[in-house]
Amino acid sequence: YEEEGFEVEFTNGGGADNTMAAVLSGSADVGFCGPEAALYIAIGGSSDSPKVFGQLTKRDGSFLVARTPEPDFKWSDLGGKEILAGRKGGVPAMTFEYVIEELGVNASLNYDVDFNYMTAAFESGIADYCTMFEPTASDYEAEGKGYIVASVGEQSGEIPYTCFAAKESYINENPEKIEGLLRAVTKATKFVME
């Protein structure tokens, strides 16, 4: 990022809704999250809505975590079970919905718990399964709090999962920064892949 002239401060927004709130308020120039939040804001009629200008990932990175080891897990095992799936309308929850609908699984998806509190809710006894990202999923398994039984992304296939978005005015006023950020991300991705 320094090669492109950036002094970057990364902050965990705690979900696409909070990330877009930071972009809209001006406390963040660029948000990195699922593309759905930018769409919801545009549909809402914002005069300076965020626009997606780059995509980083193309697959859901979450894992399905069970309370007990299930070495022979099948998606059909979720029938009649409760799953903490994320915020309703968020890409993680929509991807999970897609997976179980495609497989014809009738499960109860719990959308009542904020993304930042899903793992704590699961640990406290809410739901039979929970979707978790790394490193949390592996940490839970290492601590005996839960067991990874499936990869949501492996089952869902490719989707535009995470992207970069900024207010339209910021993009129009800072095209060199937008292009520089994308170059920096491309360089970083190539570095990681080598």
Regions found by a protein language model. Name each.
Residues 2-105, 109-112, 121, 128-135, ...:
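Short, glycine-/small- and polar/acidic-enriched structural segments
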Residues 114-194:
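Pocket-lining segment of extracytoplasmic ligand-binding domains
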